[in-house]
Every structure is written in C-alpha cells, then in structure tokens.
C-alpha cells in the first residue's frame, strides 16, 4: 500500500506546478482569503471541479514555512519526528525550499489517501493504509477496476456547500482547546487558528468537511485537513476531514 500511495503522490505532483509556478501569485499557494470560511469554500469549489492544484493553492505553503518558528514548535511538541520536521524551516535557503516542497507533497498525499478511502472497492478489508495482496492472476486488474468504478471524484462533482456549523456545536470540548490553539498559532507564526466545519450536500446526502484555517495578518489560508475539531470528533486522518453525517 505504501508503494501505491507513493505512486499516486508522484502522479499528483507531476500534474501540479513546479516550485514558483502555476498560481496567480507565482507561488504554490494562492493570494489568501478574507475569512476562514472563504478559504474552505474555495477549497471545496476546487474539489467539486476536480482541480487538485486549486485545492492545494488554498493552503498556506510558502507562508507556512516562512512564518514557522521551528524552535518554538519543537518545544511545543516536545519531540522531533523526521516525518513532521521535514516541513519545518531547519536550515538555510536550500532546506527551506525542501520544506516548502515537503509541505506541498504531504498535503497532496493526504488528498491521495482521502480519494482512496472513499473510492475503496467492495470485497476488501476497510482501507487503513495497509498492504493489499494481489498475488493471483487477475487480482491487480480486478483491484484497479474496483477503484475506477468507485471513483469518489465523480461523486464530489455533485457537492454543494449548504452552510457552516459552529465547531462548538459539533463538540463541547472545542472551546476548551483555545489555549492550545493559541500556543500552536504562536509557534506557527500566525495570528489565529480556527476550526471550520462546512455542511455539504453530496448527491442528496449530508456530509461535513472539517479543517483548520490560519490567519496571517489580514489573509486567511487553510492550514490542515481534519483539524482540531476533526480530531475531537475522532475522524480518520485518511478522511481528509470529509465525513458523512450518518457516521455520527
């Protein structure tokens, strides 16, 4: 499964702009938004249109790396994990370029996992990132055919944003995390971090999109999929914060 995720990530990145190209600002991230809800709405509109580059451009990428206080963040976390630390500004200009690329790639990999979770064919154990044995003749063909048949991106074309739900209504514990979010914002070098919950209609069914957004000065960017509220709700990291209302 890990090899499959790597292959999907390579395809995603091949379809995305090179560093410093592709968006209106000449960067991987877009110009930012006037509110957290606008940032999430732009992400969902791009998702509906099957526009991966547009989805990723709603996130803080260059700004994320440029404003991050690596020492403060490591002190907050209390541990250095290479898989996380690679997106932190740890060195000079070269390493910062690497951190930007890693940040972009990790977001793309999260979207690859989300697509796989919701496209997963029937007849297999639930998707959890584990390997799937395809050792018999015809296994690979059947597996790929199942993924193609269940292509979640086709369903997402029917997505409509109905409105937004206050995260406190989703979990009474959200307000208790205000100090934790403030410490995170301080180490990230942003002014504010909030969770956003968008209420969606997808093919006549009610869904929610949970994610965190960050304010840098007057501009808002999406910060992370799932986000603080998603963790409180117990959402799978593979979900990318997208969950049917029936799951609650």
Where are these regions (language model features)?
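Peptidyl-prolyl cis-trans isomerase
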Residues: 67, 186, 206-208
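Short beta-strand edge/turn micro-motifs at domain boundaries
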Residues: 26, 124-125, 138-142, 150, ...
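Hydrophobic beta-strand residues in large extracellular and virion-surface proteins
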Residues: 40-43, 194-200, 211-213, 220-222
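Short, low-complexity N-terminal intrinsically disordered segments enriched in polar/charged residues
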Residues: 19-49, 54-57, 61-68, 75-82, ...
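Intrinsically disordered, low-complexity Ser/Thr/Pro-rich tracts
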Residues: 1-27
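Short low-complexity, flexible loop/linker segments enriched in glycine and/or proline
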Residues: 71-72, 238
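Surface-exposed, charged secondary-structure patches
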Residues: 73-203
């Amino acid at each position: 499964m890990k090899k499959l995720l790597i292959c999907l990530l390579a395809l995603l990145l091949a379809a995305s702009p090179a560093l410093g190209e592709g968006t209106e600002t000449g960067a991987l991230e877009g110009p930012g938004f006037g509110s957290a809800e606008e940032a999430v709405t732009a992400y969902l509109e791009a998702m509906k249109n099957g526009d991966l580059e547009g989805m990723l451009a709603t996130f803080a990428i260059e700004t994320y790396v440029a404003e991050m206080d690596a020492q403060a963040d490591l002190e907050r976390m209390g541990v250095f994990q290479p898989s996380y630390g690679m997106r932190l500004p740890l060195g000079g200009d070269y390493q910062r370029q690497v951190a930007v690329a890693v940040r972009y790639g990790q977001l793309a990999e999260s979207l690859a996992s989300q697509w796989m979770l919701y496209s997963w064919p029937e007849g297999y154990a639930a998707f959890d990132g584990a390997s799937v044995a395809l050792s018999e003749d015809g296994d690979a063909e059947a597996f790929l055919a199942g993924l193609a048949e269940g292509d979640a991106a086709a369903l997402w074309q029917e997505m409509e944003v109905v409105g937004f739900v206050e995260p406190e209504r989703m979990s009474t514990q959200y307000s208790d995390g205000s100090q934790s979010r403030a410490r995170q914002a301080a180490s990230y070098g942003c002014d504010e971090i909030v969770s956003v919950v968008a209420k969606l209609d997808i093919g006549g069914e009610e869904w929610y999109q949970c994610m965190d957004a960050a304010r840098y000065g007057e501009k808002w960017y999406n910060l992370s999929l799932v986000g603080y509220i998603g963790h409180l709700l117990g959402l799978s990291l593979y979900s990318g914060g997208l969950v049917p209302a029936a799951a609650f």
